């Protein structure tokens, strides 16, 4: 998965985004300062604010600045587990796997039952080749009655079960994500389209892909590549050409387009 794709999950744009703190910093006005000045009131609040800033910078494609903000957060409050969890995601995107593991472990030590920490660590495991191990952490996240976005953990569980070759488990998780989602579950729909494609159920795959594409602007290279292969399987050369044209125009350097040029359709 690309760094952009990971950040998209965090931002809630695609598929099963990883869950981090909402970007809603809390400030109090300093009565001794001007009306324009805002200062955080305590170490925990400072840690929260800088963690949220780190999340924002990461989503905006500035991992270096994000790490600076998270360092400030942890300097303010070394026990603020959310900062470790978010820093783990940033380091995962930078392929600093050992450091990411350390951050997630620290977050889990501080908050072993926190749903967001479990979800994020599960994604780390999935992205580092431990797909089967990741499922337990997604399911642990789902145990919390206070978890506000269980559809994300179900989507991640489905995505990782699919990567592990467990098509039945993946399908069940993704269908649960659809039931619980309040934002259309575009990622879950795309993953279901992939599962049905692998199973040879091309009509069902087409339905889920069409639903996912309606929610994407622009469509991802991944979705266009699946659409191209679906049309090819069904002998629709015009449809295949349309997807190929979009893939070439939008993502000429993508791995998907390179596979197309090589004729590797599976």
List each language-model region with its residue ranges.
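Structural marker of alpha-solenoid helical repeat scaffolds
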Residues: 42, 76, 110, 144-146, ...
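Canonical tetratricopeptide repeat
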Residues: 52, 86-89, 120, 156, ...
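Terminal, low-structured helical/coil segments at or just beyond the last alpha-helical repeat
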Residues: 27-43, 214-266
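N-terminal leader/linker segments that initiate helical-solenoid repeat arrays
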Residues: 24-71, 75-77, 260-266
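Helix-start (N-cap) detector for alpha-helical repeat units in TPR-like alpha-solenoids
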Residues: 40, 47, 81-82, 115-116, ...
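Register position in tetratricopeptide repeats
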Residues: 59, 93-94, 127-128, 163-164, ...
